[in-house]
């Protein structure tokens, strides 16, 4: 493993009521040729005893002319559909091959459960003009997958590839109840107007903390994939947070991953 240090520039920092207490866990990706970043904003309610909307997913768009990130959307689950939300995180937009737009997110509900959910969005929101942050109400959702008895929580990690118009392979992270260690598995989903179908899940975790910089750090035993770039027909580079202290890069073989998914195929 090669280890190097690089100079970085802060491009997103607290500046609104939606992220005044912190900006964290960014996912950077492309939709319709544009760069988007969805991150978790620690909102003005973060330390409030009321426990409502403490964190919210904020999406910024990269402006090629300004060469800067512009905060454009904050996604708010409808109280009518979700009830009261304590937090919402592990989120990103994703466009399928048929042009349909989805929002993958992990709300923490008032009953103290966390839910791995997908909401449909109108693609027209991407063309909304202006420079201010727009609140987008999420008025629908499908729960995708529940916890295993030994898991503490699940969260969306990063999407990998679309297969055709309606299928998506994505990474999901899970924590165990005993050590609170993060591990990663993959799932294949089929998305349509009527339903979300979980077609396959790897029968074992495909990534777990192993190296010293993943085992020891500000948040030990943590590997947290946040990005993926396909570099060849078979290979995807994964970027991940390591123990909340370093950034790791790994290479994933899609052929090997599909073989693992076939072992856990449901449909």
Where are these regions (language model features)?
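Beta-rich carbohydrate-recognition and catalytic domains
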Residues: 1-20, 31-87, 94-152, 162-218, ...
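Conserved positions at the start
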Residues: 23-25, 88-91, 155-157, 225
């Amino acid at each position: 493993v090669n280890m190097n240090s690089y100079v970085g520039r802060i491009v997103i920092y607290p500046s609104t009521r939606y992220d005044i207490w912190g900006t964290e866990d960014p996912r950077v990706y492309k939709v319709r040729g544009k760069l988007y970043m969805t991150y978790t904003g620690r909102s003005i309610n973060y330390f409030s005893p009321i426990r409502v909307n403490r964190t919210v997913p904020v999406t910024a768009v990269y402006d090629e002319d300004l060469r800067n990130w512009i905060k454009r959307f904050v996604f708010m689950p409808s109280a009518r559909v979700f009830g009261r939300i304590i937090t919402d995180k592990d989120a990103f937009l994703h466009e399928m091959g048929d042009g349909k737009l989805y929002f993958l997110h992990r709300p923490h509900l008032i009953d103290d459960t966390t839910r791995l959910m997908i909401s449909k969005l109108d693609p027209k929101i991407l063309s909304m003009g202006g420079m201010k942050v727009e609140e987008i109400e999420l008025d629908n959702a499908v729960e995708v997958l529940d916890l295993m008895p030994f898991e503490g929580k699940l969260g969306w990690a990063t999407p990998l590839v679309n297969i055709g118009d309606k299928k998506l392979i994505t990474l999901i992270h899970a924590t165990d109840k005993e050590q609170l260690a993060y591990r990663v598995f993959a799932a294949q989903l089929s998305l349509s107007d009527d339903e979300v179908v979980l077609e396959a899940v790897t029968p074992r975790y495909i990534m777990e903390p192993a190296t010293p910089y993943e085992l020891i750090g500000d948040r030990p035993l943590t590997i947290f994939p946040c990005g993926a770039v396909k570099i060849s027909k078979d290979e995807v580079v994964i970027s991940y947070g390591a123990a909340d202290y370093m950034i790791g890069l790994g290479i994933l073989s899609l052929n090997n991953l599909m073989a693992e998914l076939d072992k856990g195929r449901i449909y």
